[in-house]
Amino acid sequence: NTGHWDVKRVPDSFSKSLENQPLQDTSFSFTDVPNNNAIIDDVEMKKACISMVKDFYDEGIDLDYADGGLKCRCEIASYFYDGVKKNMGIDAELSFETKPTHQLGGYNPLTNKIELNSNYLEKSDCEDLLNTILHESRHAFQNKCIDTPNSVTVKDNIIEVWKDNFDNYIRPDEDFEAYENQEIEKDANYFADSVMKKGTNPYYA
């Protein structure tokens, strides 16, 4: 994937949004999601996200996405994010926005919003979209860890590194190699890639 995700640095903002409209009920739901007030165990949360991806494909929702129109695809993406959001104990707002092709999405810790490139909705294959939702949601989770460290099991020294990275964020247009090597980007990339890889592996248990 040659595109990049963007985490906005203060006072910038990550971007993303599509018209907010009521979403219709869909035929699928995500189960066994933890309460947002509970302490989020990082390992168990990841397992829950893997199970969610597995269910998504096992139930053929990827095929529903491919066959659906833009509104249907937006609804499926939003409901997938709703499951991720509950698993992670985050409350970031999700929206789609017109962006250059190379900008996949972004998270803005100031507004607590995740913005995705609306170009995703034009593609019938939703794998990259799900990966980006997981990636940007992980940034929102990192921010949650910084704001409320007692609500997660992530170690304090890791949270300190993330906080420093958020405060001194390097944008991809400044230094792409340095951008990719930032701890919050490496963590979000690894999280999203591993969840998708295991969730789509029929032999993963």
Give, region by region, the residue ranges found by the protein language model.
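Auxiliary, metal-adjacent structural segments of Zn-dependent hydrolase domains
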Residues: 55-110
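Catalytic Zn2+-binding segment of zinc metalloproteases
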Residues: 136-154
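Surface-exposed helix-capping loop/turn segments at secondary-structure junctions
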Residues: 64, 86-90, 147-149, 197-205
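Short pre-active-site segment immediately N-terminal to the catalytic Zn-binding motif
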Residues: 115-132
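Low-complexity, glycine/serine/proline-rich disordered segments
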Residues: 1-70, 202-205
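Hydrophobic (often cysteine-bearing) scaffold residues that line and stabilize catalytic clefts
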Residues: 68-77, 126, 130, 180, ...
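Hydrophobic residues embedded in beta-strands of well-ordered beta-sheets
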Residues: 5, 112-114
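Metalloprotease/metallohydrolase-associated module, dominated by Zn2+-dependent proteases
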Residues: 151-205
